[in-house]
Amino acid sequence: MKQTTIARRVETVGIGLHKGEPIRLILEPLDANSGIILHREDLGISFKAEPKNVINTQMATVVGNEKGFISTIEHLMAAVNGYGIDNIRISVDANEIPVMDGSAISFCMLLDEAGIRHLDAGKKVILVRREVEVIEGSKFVRTSPSRNPKFDYTIKFDHPVIGEQRYLFEFSKSSFVKNIARARTFGFLKDLQRLQAQNLALGASLDNAVAIDDTHILNPEGLRFENEFVRHKILDAVGDLSLLGAPLLGDYTAFAGSHDLNHKLTLALMADEKNYEIATLSGELLKEYQKVFA
């Protein structure tokens, strides 16, 4: 199987979650072995999407350096990962990726518009060779060897609308688009009011998030899935794991995970070469994992 990029340059404009201002997003093709490059048009700086460039995981995944950063990359990165794109340049004219509708589906549509082009280089993958786990109190994230990569995620909130939810997702492009990409980010009204008092989340609205008060969902249209909350947590994980730089072929299991735990998992996995193998997807290996990229 060959590496991929997008076939043509595409762009869109959306609102930034934190500033509440319009942001131009441009996606452009790159050559083989370039990886995923994030670029600040307004500052003229670029950085690679990889674990060592993550500088904050408090409310979103943020990559950057001393010269600048790009925040809230996880939904777009989930779409890039879900589509199996190996090489792409992502440019914005501000310090965050536009939130769009709070899910990844707008980015999937943009990638559909761009098309996929295969390059003259073998596709690299990361095979999980032994279990790696990050635990903090009752929360954990784990990756383990698997011939049938899947995400098994459980969340538990002391709230009547959410409660405990678990979702098992077998990874493939088609399943990602159908079952994960449309799941929106969610937040509590009391937290939004606190953030906006600090001039954060100024772009948040019912058009780009599921809002919850003490007892109800505030969005008049309701949920897209009965368990949309846990599906969105999987979306976030797909995006966070994309910073490994190649598709992760292994199981991912989480209880009450977070961007921070996902980042720590990528660091822990790559800290010991016995944990993983970087391989070219061909021959028997391709036959074994073909459906992941279907």
Swiss-Prot record:
User: InterPro entries in the record, alphabetically?
Assistant: Ribosomal_Su5_D2-typ_SF, UDP-acyl_GlcNac_deAcase, UDP-acyl_GlcNac_deAcase_C, UDP-acyl_N-AcGlcN_deAcase_N
Keyword DNA-binding (UniProt): no
Keyword set for this entry?
Answer: Hydrolase, Lipid A biosynthesis, Lipid biosynthesis, Lipid metabolism, Metal-binding, Zinc
Gene3D superfamilies found in the cross-reference section: lpxc deacetylase, domain 1, lpxc deacetylase, domain 2
Q: Which BP terms from GO are recorded?
A: lipid A biosynthetic process
Pfam families in UniProt: LpxC
Q: Which reactions fall under this protein's catalytic activity?
A: a UDP-3-O-[(3R)-3-hydroxyacyl]-N-acetyl-alpha-D-glucosamine + H2O = a UDP-3-O-[(3R)-3-hydroxyacyl]-alpha-D-glucosamine + acetate
Documented EC number(s): 3.5.1.108
Q: In which pathway does it act?
A: Glycolipid biosynthesis; lipid IV(A) biosynthesis; lipid IV(A) from (3R)-3-hydroxytetradecanoyl-[acyl-carrier-protein] and UDP-N-acetyl-alpha-D-glucosamine: step 2/6
Any one GO CC term of this protein is:
membrane
Q: Where does Zn(2+) bind?
A: 75, 232, 236
Instruction: Please list the residues that make up the active site.
Output: 259
One GO MF term attached to the UniProt entry: metal ion binding
Family stated for the protein in its record: Belongs to the LpxC family.
Listed PANTHER family: UDP-3-O-ACYL-N-ACETYLGLUCOSAMINE DEACETYLASE 1, MITOCHONDRIAL-RELATED (PTHR33694:SF1)
Question: What does the function comment of this entry state?
Answer: Catalyzes the hydrolysis of UDP-3-O-myristoyl-N-acetylglucosamine to form UDP-3-O-myristoylglucosamine and acetate, the committed step in lipid A biosynthesis.
Descriptive protein name: UDP-3-O-acyl-N-acetylglucosamine deacetylase
Q: Which organism is it from?
A: Campylobacter concisus (strain 13826)
The primary gene name is lpxC
